[in-house]
Amino acid sequence: MDLIKQIKEQRPNLKDNSINAYLIALKKLNNNKEIEDLDFLANKEKIKEKLDDLKLTTRRNYITAVLVVLRAFDANEKLIDYYKNIINDLNEEYTGIMSKNNKSEKQEANWIELSELNKVFNSIEKEVKAMDLKNRIKLKPTDFNKLQDYVIAGLYTLLPPIRLDFAPMFVESKKSKINDSDNYLFNGGRNKKVFIINEYKNNKSHGQQTLRIPSKLNSIINLWLKYNDTGNFLLNNRREMLSANGLGKAITRIFKPTGKNITINLLRSIYISENVDMKALKKSEELAKDMMHSPAVQKGIYYKDD
């Protein structure tokens, strides 16, 4: 498969270093194997797993490479549209990052570092461990609530923080009972859990999303499910399914020891600010201004592989 020849025929003005950067990105998405065909790009879940661990700028570069090669080979339009939706969302995220980086007075007043949020999680963890829960059959309400706080704190410090999509959420162990309109913790076994997200902001363009659960969070959830057998992942004070609004309030309450008013949006902004190369993004904005085109056009022209 002559990728370079095909890309040059489709994009004759594309520089060699750009093409080389695209080929490097594609090879990485193909498990560092030489590319014999483009079938691996149809495995959306595998590609998503590889992208999830990358920085925003790198994700954009890789998806740009995917789109360039798919278009060069006149690939399936639905597959091209799928990756176009991803790049559009990444561009939207970029715009959000740039706007949020200029903090409002309210954000500035409540801004903290991720390390402060982690301190709250560690403090709750110490309290839970002191309860010796593994040797107890039932919990009193205060201990039960503290355990759920531990779960919620883990959801938003041990994972890149998504929105309030963990509530409402069902716990399900049979895939046949999972529909395409609700959110689930799929419990396939002690070490076989994933979050299945159907209802979220961009569900119309991206469809069902599957979130892997890291080992530490998996252990916390195992402990939680030992005492929570309701079939609902998170609960309100009446032991009924927690709402998204209730989860938002719980997050603010749980992180109150920081002395700040931590909302889900602020929490996400803090995470982004510490995990995205703002200097590189600002440089892109400045370059766009110097070249008299918009950042959106800048993103569509060329993404340098980092």
Question: Where do the PLM segments sit?
Answer:
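Active-site/catalytic core of tyrosine-dependent DNA strand-transfer enzymes
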Residues: 210-267, 271, 276
